């Protein structure tokens, strides 16, 4: 009888270990991807983010990281697809709105960029008010 609590604890540990290990691996891949992208090793970054997505396929942050890498490579269409995919996974993910606004600015779709920046800010993402004002000025000049 005295062993029962220890057996239960051991069983709980065995059952929870794979989930904890998977979470550790996801974060490890994400960290590798961020470091690789910061040093310009974009292909390695994409590989790391793909590995993370295999373990956690519905994570909008990881999808957004992939989009940021594509954006850094100048692959705006691929980046835009990633940001939109992230927003489908979580329509309240402010960073994806912010990143999509960067693409929209390059495409000179300033009204849409302003809307995305405002949405990102309303969701708590740190957007400088001066940047929104700049986009508003560009949008007004375009009309």
What are these regions (language model features)?
Residues 24-51, 55:
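Alpha-helical segment of the N-proximal tetratricopeptide repeat
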Residues 25-27, 60-61, 94-95, 128-129:
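Helix-start (N-cap) detector for alpha-helical repeat units in TPR-like alpha-solenoids
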Residues 30, 37, 64, 70-71, ...:
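Position-specific recognition of the canonical hydrophobic site in helix A of tetratricopeptide repeat
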Residues 38-39, 72-73, 106, 137-141:
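Register position in tetratricopeptide repeats
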């Amino acid at each position: 009888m005295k062993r029962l609590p220890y057996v239960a604890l051991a069983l709980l540990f065995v059952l929870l270990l794979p989930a904890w290990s998977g979470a550790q691996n996801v974060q490890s891949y994400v960290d590798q991807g961020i470091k690789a992208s910061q040093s310009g090793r974009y292909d390695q970054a994409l590989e790391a983010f793909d590995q993370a997505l295999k373990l956690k396929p519905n994570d909008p942050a990881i999808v957004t990281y992939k989009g940021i890498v594509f954006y850094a490579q100048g692959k705006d269409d691929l980046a835009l697809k990633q940001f939109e995919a992230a927003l489908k996974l979580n329509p309240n993910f402010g960073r994806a709105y912010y990143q999509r606004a960067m693409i929209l600015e390059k495409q000179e779709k300033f009204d849409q960029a302003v809307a995305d920046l405002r949405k990102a800010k309303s969701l708590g993402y740190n957007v400088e008010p001066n940047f929104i004002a700049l986009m508003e000025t560009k949008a007004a000049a375009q009309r």
